[in-house]
A protein has these predicted regions:
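Active-site loop segments of alpha/beta catalytic cores
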Residues: 1-144
Length: 144
């Protein structure tokens, strides 16, 4: 189950901890299945968000994976390919995949995380060509 918080990134950490974190903890504690916690624009909130109780922290495309890994209590990160890159062509996607892979490898070498799950660093944009998604998955399998 993924708890997807599109608005958390508008808050500072103090307000997040007071007005959002207790409810995120309650929601995540109410389900007995693997949980992912993701927020948009939440690079500075990742530490607080990782206290909500999920097994996986989703990372949006605005923060490098190795930086995110230093901010969380999670051993598993998910993300963080920029969904706009699906409009930029295969070469741009391939370069981004290589960059993200390098960031993940650095985080793993430091012992910050164990595992990475590939995903977009936010939702699929409405006008994205489905074939671009298929090609991105193929590139991830080749490069990632």
């Amino acid at each position: 189950m993924q708890l997807f918080d599109s608005w958390a990134g508008y808050l500072n950490e103090r307000d997040y901890r007071e007005f959002v974190l207790p409810y995120s903890q309650e929601i995540l504690a109410s389900v007995d299945i693997p949980r992912i916690h993701f927020g948009v624009g939440t690079g500075e909130l990742l530490q607080a968000m990782s206290e909500a109780g999920s097994e996986v922290m989703g990372v949006d495309y605005r923060v490098a994976m190795d930086t995110a890994a230093q901010r969380v209590n999670s051993r598993v990160l998910q993300g963080n390919l920029d969904p706009a890159l699906l409009f930029a062509g295969d070469d741009a996607v391939r370069q981004a995949v290589r960059t993200i892979r390098g960031e993940v490898e650095r985080a793993q070498q430091r012992g910050d995380i164990d595992t990475h799950i590939w995903n977009l660093g936010h939702g699929v944009l409405p006008t994205t060509d489905a074939e671009a998604i298929t090609r991105a998955v193929s590139i991830i399998h080749e490069e990632g």
